[in-house]
Regions:
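Juxtamembrane helix-loop boundaries in multi-pass membrane proteins
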Residues: 1, 144-147
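Juxtamembrane segments at transmembrane-helix boundaries
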Residues: 6-137, 144, 154, 160, ...
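Conserved nucleotide-binding and Mg2+-coordinating catalytic segments in signaling enzymes
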Residues: 174-185
Length: 185
């Protein structure tokens, strides 16, 4: 959540003189937030996180955006598809434990992840909907729609993850309350 907050802070500072630096910082923070999100899901499901893949996203997204040799719309499509791949990975992790009953937190988290993926698909198929083009006059309504979907999706994702953690804690507390202290049965 801190990385996502820093993303929006950096985007708001893009109006200053050195807006390219703030723009790259915003995408770097956003990519770090995505990597932390995947790491938290791995840790929640008690899986070993693949650290090499988690480090790739921030580095590749900032390097991809800093390349001026390719067109801006192609850069947006490449970075959006990379982020979309990480969201599909998150959906895989959320549906990994199909034997367990899906609780409300997991369902809210899946809805948030699907909304996030929808916003990325909007950017993938209409690359005009991005701040990388720096010509927002023609793309203001789709850009606003994309940011609204992203902010609502992040709210759903954070709320769902906190609900999942609370429900897991409640299950563990109920299990410990049913165990006899002396016999551990």
């Amino acid at each position: 959540l801190v990385c996502y907050g820093m993303t929006y802070l950096s985007i708001s500072l893009m109006a200053s003189a050195g807006h390219v630096r703030w723009f790259l910082a915003a995408y770097g923070f956003f990519a770090c937030g995505q990597s932390c999100w995947i790491w938290a899901l791995h840790r929640f499901h008690q899986l070993r996180p693949p650290y090499a893949l988690l480090v790739v996203l921030p580095i590749v997204s900032v390097l991809g955006l800093s390349l001026d040799s390719i067109s801006a719309s192609l850069r947006v499509q490449l970075i959006s598809s990379l982020f979309l791949g990480y969201e599909i990975w998150a959906l895989y992790l959320l549906t990994l434990r199909r034997a367990e009953a899906m609780n409300r937190g997991t369902m809210v988290l899946i809805v948030g992840t699907l909304m996030f993926a929808a916003a990325l698909l909007l950017r993938l198929h209409t690359p005009v909907v991005s701040l990388t083009l720096r010509d927002t006059a023609a793309s203001t309504p789709p850009l606003l729609l994309s940011f609204v979907i992203l902010s609502i999706a992040m709210h759903f994702k954070s709320t769902g993850f906190l609900m999942m953690c609370h429900e897991r804690k409640q299950v563990l507390l109920d299990r410990m309350a049913n165990v006899d202290v002396l016999t551990e049965l």
